[in-house]
Amino acid sequence: MSHSNHFDVIVIGSGPGGEGAAMGLTKAGLNVAIIEKESSVGGGCTHWGTIPSKALRHAVSRIIEFNSNPLFCQNNKSIHSTFSNILGHAKSVIDKQTRLRQGFYDRNQCTLVFGTARFIDTHTISVMQSDGTEEHYSADKFVIATGSRPYQPDNVDFMHERVYDSDSILSLKHDPQHIIIYGAGVIGCEYASIFRGLGVKTDLINTRDRLLSFLDNETSDALSYHFWNSGVVIRNDETFEKIEGTDDGVIIHLESGKKMRADCLLYANGRTGNTDKLNLGAVGLEADSRGQVSVNSNYQTSVEHVYAVGDVIGYPSLASAAYDQGRFVAQAVVKGEAERHLIEDIPTGIYTIPEISSVGKTEQELTAAKVPYEVGRSSFKHLARAQIAGKDIGSLKILFHRETKEILGIHVFGERAAEIIHIGQAIMEQKGEANTIEYFVNTTFNYPTMAEAYRVAALNGLNRLF
Protein backbone atom coordinates (compact mmCIF):
# COMPACT_ATOMS: atom_id res chain seq x y z
CA MET A 1 0.00 0.00 0.00
CA SER A 2 1.38 3.41 -0.96
CA HIS A 3 1.98 6.04 1.68
CA SER A 4 -0.58 8.26 -0.09
CA ASN A 5 -3.29 5.73 0.76
CA HIS A 6 -2.85 6.21 4.51
CA PHE A 7 -4.90 8.82 6.36
CA ASP A 8 -5.32 10.08 9.89
CA VAL A 9 -9.05 9.39 9.66
CA ILE A 10 -11.26 7.68 7.10
CA VAL A 11 -14.95 8.61 7.15
CA ILE A 12 -17.27 6.08 5.52
CA GLY A 13 -20.34 7.82 4.11
CA SER A 14 -20.89 11.41 2.90
CA GLY A 15 -24.36 12.07 4.29
CA PRO A 16 -24.94 14.71 7.00
CA GLY A 17 -23.06 12.73 9.68
CA GLY A 18 -20.08 12.01 7.45
CA GLU A 19 -19.97 15.57 6.18
CA GLY A 20 -20.03 17.04 9.68
CA ALA A 21 -17.24 14.72 10.79
CA ALA A 22 -15.08 15.29 7.70
CA MET A 23 -15.37 19.08 7.88
CA GLY A 24 -14.54 19.15 11.59
CA LEU A 25 -11.55 16.85 11.16
CA THR A 26 -10.05 18.62 8.14
CA LYS A 27 -10.42 22.03 9.79
CA ALA A 28 -8.50 20.60 12.76
CA GLY A 29 -5.60 19.85 10.41
CA LEU A 30 -6.03 16.10 10.02
CA ASN A 31 -5.53 14.24 6.75
CA VAL A 32 -9.01 12.89 5.99
CA ALA A 33 -10.53 10.67 3.31
CA ILE A 34 -14.25 10.18 2.85
CA ILE A 35 -15.59 7.07 1.12
CA GLU A 36 -18.90 7.34 -0.76
CA LYS A 37 -20.50 4.33 -2.43
CA GLU A 38 -22.65 6.40 -4.81
CA SER A 39 -21.39 8.48 -7.73
CA SER A 40 -21.90 11.80 -5.93
CA VAL A 41 -21.82 13.09 -2.36
CA GLY A 42 -24.76 13.80 -0.07
CA GLY A 43 -25.91 10.38 1.09
CA GLY A 44 -29.47 9.18 1.40
CA CYS A 45 -30.62 12.51 2.86
CA THR A 46 -29.79 14.36 -0.36
CA HIS A 47 -30.62 11.72 -2.96
CA TRP A 48 -33.56 9.64 -1.62
CA GLY A 49 -34.73 11.06 1.69
CA THR A 50 -35.13 14.53 3.14
CA ILE A 51 -34.35 16.69 0.11
CA PRO A 52 -36.37 14.97 -2.66
CA SER A 53 -39.42 14.25 -0.49
CA LYS A 54 -39.56 17.85 0.75
CA ALA A 55 -39.10 19.20 -2.79
CA LEU A 56 -41.98 16.99 -3.92
CA ARG A 57 -44.11 18.12 -1.01
CA HIS A 58 -43.44 21.78 -1.80
CA ALA A 59 -44.49 21.35 -5.42
CA VAL A 60 -47.68 19.55 -4.41
CA SER A 61 -48.58 22.13 -1.76
CA ARG A 62 -48.23 24.92 -4.35
CA ILE A 63 -50.59 23.05 -6.69
CA ILE A 64 -53.11 22.69 -3.85
CA GLU A 65 -52.73 26.39 -3.01
CA PHE A 66 -53.35 27.43 -6.62
CA ASN A 67 -56.38 25.21 -7.05
CA SER A 68 -57.97 26.34 -3.78
CA ASN A 69 -57.51 30.08 -4.38
CA PRO A 70 -60.42 31.65 -6.32
CA LEU A 71 -58.13 34.50 -7.40
CA PHE A 72 -56.13 32.07 -9.55
CA CYS A 73 -58.56 29.25 -10.17
CA GLN A 74 -61.35 30.85 -12.18
CA ASN A 75 -64.03 29.35 -14.43
CA ASN A 76 -63.54 26.00 -12.69
CA LYS A 77 -60.07 25.71 -14.22
CA SER A 78 -57.42 24.01 -12.14
CA ILE A 79 -53.91 22.76 -12.72
CA HIS A 80 -52.98 19.12 -12.40
CA SER A 81 -49.69 17.29 -12.37
CA THR A 82 -48.41 13.78 -11.86
CA PHE A 83 -45.85 12.35 -9.48
CA SER A 84 -43.45 11.62 -12.33
CA ASN A 85 -43.76 15.19 -13.64
CA ILE A 86 -42.92 16.89 -10.35
CA LEU A 87 -39.94 14.59 -9.83
CA GLY A 88 -38.09 16.96 -12.17
CA HIS A 89 -38.37 19.70 -9.54
CA ALA A 90 -36.89 17.40 -6.92
CA LYS A 91 -34.00 16.46 -9.22
CA SER A 92 -33.04 20.09 -9.77
CA VAL A 93 -32.83 20.63 -6.00
CA ILE A 94 -30.78 17.44 -5.56
CA ASP A 95 -28.31 18.63 -8.21
CA LYS A 96 -27.89 22.00 -6.48
CA GLN A 97 -27.34 20.35 -3.09
CA THR A 98 -24.82 17.90 -4.55
CA ARG A 99 -22.76 20.69 -6.17
CA LEU A 100 -22.84 22.68 -2.93
CA ARG A 101 -21.58 19.76 -0.86
CA GLN A 102 -18.95 18.75 -3.39
CA GLY A 103 -17.59 22.28 -3.01
CA PHE A 104 -17.20 21.80 0.76
CA TYR A 105 -14.86 18.84 0.23
CA ASP A 106 -12.92 20.56 -2.56
CA ARG A 107 -12.30 23.75 -0.57
CA ASN A 108 -11.22 21.86 2.53
CA GLN A 109 -8.91 19.52 0.59
CA CYS A 110 -10.68 16.40 1.81
CA THR A 111 -9.86 13.33 -0.28
CA LEU A 112 -12.98 11.84 -1.88
CA VAL A 113 -13.00 8.18 -2.87
CA PHE A 114 -16.04 6.75 -4.67
CA GLY A 115 -16.74 3.08 -4.10
CA THR A 116 -18.05 0.52 -1.61
CA ALA A 117 -15.96 0.13 1.53
CA ARG A 118 -15.42 -2.93 3.70
CA PHE A 119 -12.95 -3.63 6.47
CA ILE A 120 -10.22 -6.19 5.78
CA ASP A 121 -8.37 -5.74 9.07
CA THR A 122 -8.40 -3.42 12.08
CA HIS A 123 -6.84 -0.47 10.25
CA THR A 124 -7.47 -1.19 6.57
CA ILE A 125 -10.44 -1.00 4.26
CA SER A 126 -10.94 -2.20 0.72
CA VAL A 127 -12.88 0.03 -1.67
CA MET A 128 -14.56 -1.59 -4.67
CA GLN A 129 -14.99 1.01 -7.38
CA SER A 130 -17.66 1.12 -10.09
CA ASP A 131 -15.26 -0.22 -12.75
CA GLY A 132 -14.57 -3.31 -10.65
CA THR A 133 -11.12 -2.26 -9.48
CA GLU A 134 -10.24 -2.59 -5.81
CA GLU A 135 -8.04 -0.26 -3.78
CA HIS A 136 -6.87 -0.51 -0.18
CA TYR A 137 -6.76 2.42 2.24
CA SER A 138 -5.57 2.55 5.84
CA ALA A 139 -6.15 4.97 8.69
CA ASP A 140 -5.41 5.47 12.35
CA LYS A 141 -9.10 6.00 13.06
CA PHE A 142 -12.43 5.45 11.32
CA VAL A 143 -15.85 7.09 11.47
CA ILE A 144 -18.77 4.97 10.25
CA ALA A 145 -21.51 7.22 8.85
CA THR A 146 -23.17 4.87 6.39
CA GLY A 147 -26.75 5.83 7.24
CA SER A 148 -29.77 3.60 6.80
CA ARG A 149 -32.05 2.23 4.09
CA PRO A 150 -35.70 1.16 3.94
CA TYR A 151 -36.36 -2.13 5.70
CA GLN A 152 -37.33 -4.86 3.24
CA PRO A 153 -38.89 -7.97 4.80
CA ASP A 154 -38.10 -11.23 3.02
CA ASN A 155 -41.76 -12.02 2.35
CA VAL A 156 -42.33 -8.91 0.21
CA ASP A 157 -41.29 -9.03 -3.46
CA PHE A 158 -39.60 -5.68 -4.01
CA MET A 159 -38.54 -6.82 -7.47
CA HIS A 160 -42.16 -6.53 -8.61
CA GLU A 161 -42.58 -3.41 -10.73
CA ARG A 162 -45.52 -2.13 -8.65
CA VAL A 163 -43.99 -2.62 -5.18
CA TYR A 164 -41.83 0.26 -3.94
CA ASP A 165 -39.93 1.39 -0.88
CA SER A 166 -39.20 5.03 0.00
CA ASP A 167 -36.03 4.96 -2.14
CA SER A 168 -37.39 3.28 -5.26
CA ILE A 169 -40.60 5.36 -5.24
CA LEU A 170 -38.46 8.19 -6.61
CA SER A 171 -38.09 6.12 -9.79
CA LEU A 172 -41.86 5.86 -10.26
CA LYS A 173 -42.55 6.14 -13.99
CA HIS A 174 -46.28 5.37 -14.31
CA ASP A 175 -49.00 7.56 -12.85
CA PRO A 176 -51.06 5.57 -10.33
CA GLN A 177 -54.71 6.33 -9.75
CA HIS A 178 -54.66 4.44 -6.45
CA ILE A 179 -51.80 3.75 -4.02
CA ILE A 180 -51.56 1.73 -0.82
CA ILE A 181 -48.98 2.97 1.70
CA TYR A 182 -48.03 0.35 4.28
CA GLY A 183 -46.59 2.00 7.37
CA ALA A 184 -47.89 5.27 8.82
CA GLY A 185 -44.72 6.62 10.36
CA VAL A 186 -43.22 9.94 9.33
CA ILE A 187 -42.27 8.76 5.82
CA GLY A 188 -45.61 7.06 5.20
CA CYS A 189 -47.60 10.09 6.34
CA GLU A 190 -45.51 12.49 4.27
CA TYR A 191 -45.99 10.43 1.11
CA ALA A 192 -49.71 10.06 1.87
CA SER A 193 -49.91 13.87 1.80
CA ILE A 194 -47.99 14.04 -1.48
CA PHE A 195 -50.02 11.44 -3.35
CA ARG A 196 -53.38 12.59 -2.04
CA GLY A 197 -52.43 16.17 -2.93
CA LEU A 198 -51.95 14.98 -6.51
CA GLY A 199 -55.45 13.51 -6.50
CA VAL A 200 -54.32 9.89 -6.14
CA LYS A 201 -56.68 7.66 -4.16
CA THR A 202 -54.63 6.85 -1.05
CA ASP A 203 -55.00 4.07 1.53
CA LEU A 204 -52.71 4.42 4.56
CA ILE A 205 -52.22 1.25 6.60
CA ASN A 206 -51.01 1.91 10.14
CA THR A 207 -49.57 -0.89 12.27
CA ARG A 208 -50.35 1.10 15.44
CA ASP A 209 -53.53 2.39 17.06
CA ARG A 210 -53.02 6.05 16.11
CA LEU A 211 -50.95 8.11 13.70
CA LEU A 212 -47.51 9.22 14.90
CA SER A 213 -48.18 8.25 18.51
CA PHE A 214 -45.01 10.02 19.73
CA LEU A 215 -46.70 13.35 19.02
CA ASP A 216 -49.00 15.23 21.36
CA ASN A 217 -52.41 13.55 21.10
CA GLU A 218 -54.13 16.70 19.83
CA THR A 219 -51.60 17.01 17.00
CA SER A 220 -51.98 13.36 16.06
CA ASP A 221 -55.76 13.74 16.08
CA ALA A 222 -55.54 16.88 13.93
CA LEU A 223 -53.46 15.05 11.32
CA SER A 224 -55.92 12.14 11.31
CA TYR A 225 -58.81 14.53 10.80
CA HIS A 226 -57.14 16.39 7.92
CA PHE A 227 -56.19 13.13 6.24
CA TRP A 228 -59.79 11.98 6.59
CA ASN A 229 -61.06 15.32 5.32
CA SER A 230 -58.81 15.14 2.24
CA GLY A 231 -59.96 11.61 1.43
CA VAL A 232 -57.10 9.48 2.76
CA VAL A 233 -58.43 6.16 4.08
CA ILE A 234 -56.59 5.20 7.29
CA ARG A 235 -56.58 1.62 8.59
CA ASN A 236 -55.23 1.49 12.15
CA ASP A 237 -53.94 -1.58 14.01
CA GLU A 238 -53.37 -3.61 10.85
CA THR A 239 -50.58 -6.01 9.86
CA PHE A 240 -50.08 -7.49 6.43
CA GLU A 241 -50.31 -11.23 5.92
CA LYS A 242 -49.34 -11.28 2.26
CA ILE A 243 -48.53 -8.76 -0.47
CA GLU A 244 -49.42 -10.11 -3.89
CA GLY A 245 -48.19 -8.50 -7.10
CA THR A 246 -50.43 -8.72 -10.16
CA ASP A 247 -50.00 -7.73 -13.80
CA ASP A 248 -51.55 -4.32 -13.23
CA GLY A 249 -51.15 -3.66 -9.52
CA VAL A 250 -50.90 -5.05 -6.01
CA ILE A 251 -53.25 -6.83 -3.61
CA ILE A 252 -52.49 -6.68 0.11
CA HIS A 253 -54.00 -9.27 2.45
CA LEU A 254 -54.26 -8.16 6.09
CA GLU A 255 -54.22 -10.41 9.14
CA SER A 256 -57.61 -8.96 10.12
CA GLY A 257 -59.11 -10.65 7.07
CA LYS A 258 -59.37 -7.52 4.94
CA LYS A 259 -57.79 -7.26 1.52
CA MET A 260 -57.19 -4.20 -0.62
CA ARG A 261 -56.14 -3.63 -4.21
CA ALA A 262 -54.33 -0.68 -5.80
CA ASP A 263 -52.16 0.26 -8.76
CA CYS A 264 -49.03 0.17 -6.59
CA LEU A 265 -47.83 -0.19 -3.02
CA LEU A 266 -45.30 1.86 -1.07
CA TYR A 267 -43.78 -0.14 1.80
CA ALA A 268 -42.68 2.41 4.40
CA ASN A 269 -42.48 0.43 7.62
CA GLY A 270 -39.07 0.84 9.22
CA ARG A 271 -35.43 1.32 8.29
CA THR A 272 -32.23 -0.66 8.85
CA GLY A 273 -28.63 0.46 9.28
CA ASN A 274 -26.21 0.14 6.36
CA THR A 275 -23.63 -2.08 8.03
CA ASP A 276 -24.13 -5.47 6.39
CA LYS A 277 -21.50 -4.90 3.69
CA LEU A 278 -18.85 -3.34 5.94
CA ASN A 279 -17.47 -6.69 7.16
CA LEU A 280 -17.49 -5.34 10.72
CA GLY A 281 -16.16 -8.65 12.06
CA ALA A 282 -12.76 -7.86 10.56
CA VAL A 283 -12.42 -4.90 12.91
CA GLY A 284 -14.02 -6.66 15.90
CA LEU A 285 -17.49 -5.11 15.73
CA GLU A 286 -20.97 -6.57 15.45
CA ALA A 287 -24.19 -4.81 14.46
CA ASP A 288 -27.52 -5.58 16.12
CA SER A 289 -30.60 -7.02 14.39
CA ARG A 290 -31.44 -3.58 12.98
CA GLY A 291 -27.99 -3.09 11.48
CA GLN A 292 -27.02 -0.53 14.12
CA VAL A 293 -23.86 -0.25 16.22
CA SER A 294 -23.60 0.89 19.82
CA VAL A 295 -21.50 3.90 20.83
CA ASN A 296 -20.59 5.73 24.03
CA SER A 297 -21.02 9.45 24.76
CA ASN A 298 -18.05 10.20 22.50
CA TYR A 299 -19.60 8.22 19.61
CA GLN A 300 -16.90 5.62 20.10
CA THR A 301 -17.75 1.97 19.45
CA SER A 302 -16.44 -0.95 21.50
CA VAL A 303 -13.35 -0.80 19.26
CA GLU A 304 -11.31 2.17 20.47
CA HIS A 305 -10.30 3.61 17.09
CA VAL A 306 -13.70 3.18 15.39
CA TYR A 307 -16.49 5.74 15.82
CA ALA A 308 -20.02 5.94 14.41
CA VAL A 309 -22.66 8.66 13.91
CA GLY A 310 -26.05 9.19 12.29
CA ASP A 311 -28.77 6.68 11.47
CA VAL A 312 -26.33 3.80 11.90
CA ILE A 313 -26.38 4.36 15.69
CA GLY A 314 -30.18 4.73 15.93
CA TYR A 315 -32.15 7.46 17.71
CA PRO A 316 -32.85 10.21 16.84
CA SER A 317 -32.18 9.31 13.17
CA LEU A 318 -32.51 12.89 11.93
CA ALA A 319 -30.34 14.56 9.30
CA SER A 320 -29.90 17.63 11.50
CA ALA A 321 -28.85 15.54 14.49
CA ALA A 322 -26.49 13.44 12.34
CA TYR A 323 -24.62 16.56 11.21
CA ASP A 324 -24.22 17.68 14.83
CA GLN A 325 -23.05 14.20 15.82
CA GLY A 326 -20.46 14.44 13.05
CA ARG A 327 -19.13 17.70 14.47
CA PHE A 328 -19.04 16.23 17.97
CA VAL A 329 -17.23 13.06 16.89
CA ALA A 330 -14.59 15.24 15.23
CA GLN A 331 -14.01 16.86 18.63
CA ALA A 332 -13.75 13.43 20.25
CA VAL A 333 -11.20 12.22 17.69
CA VAL A 334 -9.06 15.36 17.91
CA LYS A 335 -9.27 16.10 21.64
CA GLY A 336 -10.14 12.71 23.11
CA GLU A 337 -13.56 13.86 24.24
CA ALA A 338 -16.58 15.52 22.65
CA GLU A 339 -16.95 19.05 23.99
CA ARG A 340 -20.68 19.16 23.26
CA HIS A 341 -23.55 16.72 22.86
CA LEU A 342 -27.00 16.75 21.31
CA ILE A 343 -29.48 18.97 23.08
CA GLU A 344 -32.07 17.22 25.22
CA ASP A 345 -35.12 18.61 23.44
CA ILE A 346 -34.56 17.97 19.74
CA PRO A 347 -37.30 19.50 17.57
CA THR A 348 -39.36 17.26 15.33
CA GLY A 349 -40.32 18.44 11.85
CA ILE A 350 -42.86 16.40 9.86
CA TYR A 351 -43.59 17.62 6.34
CA THR A 352 -47.13 16.44 5.91
CA ILE A 353 -49.81 18.73 4.51
CA PRO A 354 -50.43 20.55 6.87
CA GLU A 355 -46.94 20.61 8.39
CA ILE A 356 -46.17 19.50 11.96
CA SER A 357 -43.42 20.43 14.39
CA SER A 358 -42.90 20.00 18.11
CA VAL A 359 -40.27 20.34 20.80
CA GLY A 360 -40.29 19.29 24.43
CA LYS A 361 -42.95 17.39 26.35
CA THR A 362 -46.43 16.37 25.25
CA GLU A 363 -49.54 16.78 27.38
CA GLN A 364 -49.74 13.04 27.98
CA GLU A 365 -46.11 12.94 29.19
CA LEU A 366 -46.63 15.85 31.59
CA THR A 367 -49.86 14.36 32.92
CA ALA A 368 -48.19 10.99 33.52
CA ALA A 369 -45.32 12.72 35.35
CA LYS A 370 -47.84 14.72 37.46
CA VAL A 371 -46.34 18.06 36.40
CA PRO A 372 -48.69 21.01 37.12
CA TYR A 373 -48.80 22.57 33.67
CA GLU A 374 -51.08 24.96 31.84
CA VAL A 375 -51.86 25.36 28.14
CA GLY A 376 -51.76 28.44 25.91
CA ARG A 377 -53.29 28.20 22.45
CA SER A 378 -53.33 30.27 19.30
CA SER A 379 -55.42 29.41 16.25
CA PHE A 380 -53.92 30.36 12.88
CA LYS A 381 -57.33 31.42 11.57
CA HIS A 382 -57.16 34.44 13.90
CA LEU A 383 -53.73 35.61 12.66
CA ALA A 384 -53.70 38.37 10.05
CA ARG A 385 -50.68 36.89 8.25
CA ALA A 386 -52.37 33.49 7.95
CA GLN A 387 -55.53 35.13 6.61
CA ILE A 388 -53.52 37.10 4.04
CA ALA A 389 -51.67 33.98 2.90
CA GLY A 390 -54.80 31.86 2.88
CA LYS A 391 -53.09 29.47 5.30
CA ASP A 392 -55.48 29.66 8.22
CA ILE A 393 -55.56 25.94 9.07
CA GLY A 394 -53.50 25.18 12.14
CA SER A 395 -52.59 26.18 15.65
CA LEU A 396 -49.76 26.67 18.11
CA LYS A 397 -49.86 25.26 21.63
CA ILE A 398 -47.50 26.16 24.48
CA LEU A 399 -47.27 23.95 27.58
CA PHE A 400 -45.79 25.71 30.61
CA HIS A 401 -45.36 25.15 34.35
CA ARG A 402 -48.10 26.81 36.39
CA GLU A 403 -45.78 28.02 39.15
CA THR A 404 -42.47 28.80 37.44
CA LYS A 405 -43.93 29.63 34.00
CA GLU A 406 -41.13 27.58 32.44
CA ILE A 407 -41.93 26.46 28.89
CA LEU A 408 -42.15 22.66 28.84
CA GLY A 409 -43.30 21.93 25.31
CA ILE A 410 -44.44 23.57 22.08
CA HIS A 411 -46.59 21.95 19.41
CA VAL A 412 -47.34 23.52 16.03
CA PHE A 413 -49.70 22.25 13.35
CA GLY A 414 -50.00 24.16 10.10
CA GLU A 415 -48.11 26.09 7.44
CA ARG A 416 -44.42 26.73 8.23
CA ALA A 417 -44.64 24.78 11.49
CA ALA A 418 -41.04 23.56 11.20
CA GLU A 419 -39.85 27.18 10.92
CA ILE A 420 -42.13 28.60 13.62
CA ILE A 421 -41.01 26.03 16.20
CA HIS A 422 -37.48 27.44 16.45
CA ILE A 423 -38.64 30.70 18.01
CA GLY A 424 -40.02 28.80 20.99
CA GLN A 425 -37.10 26.38 21.00
CA ALA A 426 -34.68 29.31 21.41
CA ILE A 427 -36.46 30.40 24.60
CA MET A 428 -36.76 26.84 25.92
CA GLU A 429 -32.99 26.42 25.62
CA GLN A 430 -32.32 29.40 27.91
CA LYS A 431 -31.16 28.57 31.41
CA GLY A 432 -33.10 29.15 34.62
CA GLU A 433 -35.60 32.01 34.75
CA ALA A 434 -34.78 33.05 31.17
CA ASN A 435 -36.95 30.17 29.99
CA THR A 436 -40.35 31.72 30.60
CA ILE A 437 -43.58 32.08 28.69
CA GLU A 438 -43.64 35.74 29.74
CA TYR A 439 -40.94 36.45 27.15
CA PHE A 440 -43.58 36.26 24.43
CA VAL A 441 -45.77 38.81 26.20
CA ASN A 442 -42.98 41.25 26.97
CA THR A 443 -41.30 41.27 23.54
CA THR A 444 -42.55 43.04 20.40
CA PHE A 445 -43.27 40.96 17.29
CA ASN A 446 -43.34 42.14 13.71
CA TYR A 447 -46.91 42.47 12.44
CA PRO A 448 -48.39 40.70 10.62
CA THR A 449 -46.38 37.50 11.10
CA MET A 450 -46.98 33.86 11.89
CA ALA A 451 -44.60 34.34 14.84
CA GLU A 452 -47.29 36.45 16.48
CA ALA A 453 -48.96 33.15 17.36
CA TYR A 454 -46.55 32.94 20.30
CA ARG A 455 -47.82 36.20 21.80
CA VAL A 456 -51.45 35.16 21.35
CA ALA A 457 -50.82 31.71 22.85
CA ALA A 458 -48.84 33.17 25.76
CA LEU A 459 -51.62 35.60 26.66
CA ASN A 460 -54.17 32.81 26.34
CA GLY A 461 -52.19 30.58 28.69
CA LEU A 462 -51.38 33.23 31.29
CA ASN A 463 -55.04 34.24 31.42
CA ARG A 464 -55.84 30.71 32.62
CA LEU A 465 -53.77 31.13 35.79
CA PHE A 466 -55.43 31.98 39.10
Curated annotation (Swiss-Prot):
Chief location of this protein within or outside the cell: cytoplasm
GO cellular component: cytosol
Record localization: Cytoplasm
Enzyme class: oxidoreductase
Top-level taxonomic group: Bacteria
Annotated positions binding FAD: 36-45
Pfam families: Pyr_redox_2 (PF07992), Pyr_redox_dim (PF02852)
Cofactor mode of binding and number, as noted: Binds 1 FAD per subunit.
An example molecular function term from Gene Ontology annotations: dihydrolipoyl dehydrogenase (NADH) activity
Requisite cofactors: FAD
Keyword NADP included in the entry's annotation: yes
E.C. no: 1.6.1.1
BP GO terms, sorted: 2-oxoglutarate metabolic process; NADP metabolic process
Catalytically driven reaction(s): NAD(+) + NADPH = NADH + NADP(+)
Family membership noted in the UniProt record: Belongs to the class-I pyridine nucleotide-disulfide oxidoreductase family.
Free-text function comment from the UniProt entry: Conversion of NADPH, generated by peripheral catabolic pathways, to NADH, which can enter the respiratory chain for energy generation.
PANTHER family: DISULFIDE OXIDOREDUCTASE, SOLUBLE PYRIDINE NUCLEOTIDE TRANSHYDROGENASE
UniProt-recorded name of the protein: Soluble pyridine nucleotide transhydrogenase
